[in-house]
Amino acid sequence: MRLMKKVKLNSYAKVNIGLKLLNKRVDGYHNISTIFQEIDLHDEITITKSSKGALEFSSNVKWLKNNQDNLCIAAYSCIKDLYDIDGVHINLVKNISRGSGLGGGSSNAATVMKGLRQIFNLEITDKELEKISVEIGADVPFFIRGNTQIGEGVGEKLSNIKFSMKGLFLIVTPDVSIDTKWAYSQIKNVLDKAVPATKFFDSFSGKTVNLSTLKFFENDFESVVFPTYPE
């Protein structure tokens, strides 16, 4: 078998087509109902085996550091704990805006995990990657799977749905970064009037949806984010 020295992968963004917050769990997280949709916007990740035997990281942005707050680094550490892999150099070209809700960091983590599996020929399935990747972030499992998924639990419980859409997504990202922890901390009033999950999925029939038939899908975070960041 030919051993790989380098892999280059696209790390795709996502949009949430509606997001309902249901309740706060005893572990401090929130149960949600949402639809994750993978989109073409992507970062680029190149993983190269390193002769130095250590992990190295580089990027076109300065705000990403070589520490565990960087989800590329966290993903490498997660895989290394299981397989004791050698060192690599991870280069990340960022195109997805941070704090935009497009899942850039989680996507990067999932892509690094899949890239490490490929370059080191690791015998680990997507399902197994999904299970361990939730330790990094609640929506990382979605990026292991991709396509279109109903997300429940904290976002890690995924159900594939058929999704037919004609047209394009228009992604507008103002110069604002929304911290996820802050957004969840402001959400108590929304939870008091949260719509049950059964209502959220009333527009589905047989887990098949056509976006052209949907007039509007609400995102509960809008009620706390828009007043603070009207732009």
Where would I find each of the regions flagged by the language model?
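Short glycine- and Lys/Arg-enriched binding-loop motifs that mark or flank ligand-binding interfaces
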Residues: 14, 24, 95-101, 111, ...
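Short, charged, solvent-exposed linker or helix-capping segments at domain edges/interfaces
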Residues: 56-57, 102, 180-185
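DPxDG-like acidic metal-binding loop motif
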Residues: 100-131, 142
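ATP-binding N-lobe of GHMP and related small-molecule kinases
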Residues: 2-100, 118-127, 163-164, 173-176
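Conserved, helical-rich catalytic subdomain that frames metal- and/or nucleotide-binding sites
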Residues: 145, 150-231
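Short, basic/glycine-rich phosphate-binding loops at helix/coil junctions
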Residues: 51-65, 112, 134, 209-219
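A short, flexible low-complexity segment enriched in Lys/Arg and Gly/Pro that occurs
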Residues: 73-88, 114, 215-231
